[in-house]
Regions:
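Alpha/beta enzyme core
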Residues: 12, 17-23, 33-56, 61, ...
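Short, glycine/acidic-enriched loop or turn micro-motifs at the edges of active sites
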Residues: 25, 84, 206
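Active-site flanking residues adjacent to catalytic metal/cofactor-binding acidic residues
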Residues: 80
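Conserved small/polar residues in nucleotide/adenosyl-binding loops
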Residues: 200-206
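N-terminal basic/disordered segments at the start of proteins
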Residues: 2-15
Length: 210
C-alpha cells in the first residue's frame, strides 16, 4: 500500500481534491471553446462516461465569454485553462468558473498574477499551477516578462533527467523553480487554494524526476 503525504483539501465546485479524498476523473475538451454548443455536447458525453471535472482552453476573449454560458449548461465543475493574458482569467472568474489553470511560463507579470489571485481569493476559486516545458521562462529570467525560452537563453541545452552532473542546473531545476516562483506569489497573498502543481515535459524520465 502506498503511503501518501497528508494534504490540505481543496474544493473545485463541490468536488474535493486532496485531504484523503478519492481520486477524481478529469478531462479536457478538444472542441473550440467559442463553439458553446459543440463544447457542451462533448462535456455531456464525458459526464456520461464518468468525468467529474472538465477543463476548457481559453485562448482569447471570445472563449472567456463562452465559458459563462458553458457553465450554465453543464453539471460538473468547470476549469479555465488560461492562455497568455491575465484578463482572460478575470473574465472567467466573473463568469463563474470553478477553477483556474495558470501557466507561469506565459503569464509572467507579477502584478497581473497578483490581480488574478486576489480575484480568485474573493470568490474562493482554487488555482492549478501548470508548468509546461514548451513555454518556460528564459534561464535566469524567471519572473521576467519578455522572451519565450524554447527559442532562446539555453533552456533546450539544459541537461535532462539523469544527465546533470552534481550541482549542475538542469531542466528539472528550472521547471521546479518556475513553479516555486508562482507559488510564492500566491502565498504572499495568503492564498492556499492550490489545487495541484503539474509539470509537462517531452520525456517521461524528466516528468518523473520533476
Amino acid at each position: 500500500m502506498t503511503n501518501r503525504r497528508a494534504t490540505k483539501p481543496v474544493f473545485v465546485g463541490g468536488v474535493k481534491i486532496g485531504g484523503g479524498a478519492d481520486v477524481t476523473v478529469q478531462s479536457m475538451t478538444k472542441t473550440d471553446t467559442r463553439d458553446v454548443k459543440a463544447t457542451v455536447k462533448q462535456i455531456h458525453e464525458l459526464e456520461e462516461a464518468g468525468c467529474e471535472l472538465i477543463r476548457c482552453a481559453v485562448p482569447d476573449s471570445d472563449a472567456a465569454e463562452a465559458m459563462a454560458e458553458i457553465k450554465k449548461q453543464i453539471h460538473i465543475p468547470l476549469i479555465a485553462d488560461i492562455h497568455f493574458h491575465y484578463q482572460l482569467a478575470l473574465k472567467c472568474l466573473e463568469g463563474g468558473v470553478d477553477c483556474l489553470r495558470l501557466n507561469p511560463g506565459n503569464l509572467r507579470n507579477e502584478d497581473q498574477v497578483r490581480e488574478v489571485v486576489r480575484s480568485a481569493k474573493e470568490r474562493d476559486v482554487p488555482i492549478r499551477i501548470g508548468v509546461n516545458f514548451g513555454s518556460l521562462p528564459p534561464v535566469g529570467g524567471i519572473g521576467r516578462t519578455r522572451g519565450f525560452s524554447r527559442h532562446m537563453d539555453l533552456v533546450n541545452s539544459l541537461p535532462k533527467a539523469g544527465e546533470a552532473r552534481e550541482g549542475e542546473y538542469s531542466v528539472v531545476d528550472h521547471m521546479v523553480a518556475t513553479a516555486l516562483w508562482e507559488i510564492s506569489l500566491l502565498e504572499e497573498q495568503n492564498f492556499d487554494q492550490i489545487k495541484t502543481v503539474s509539470y509537462t515535459h517531452l520525456t517521461l524520465p524528466t516528468n518523473r524526476e520533476v
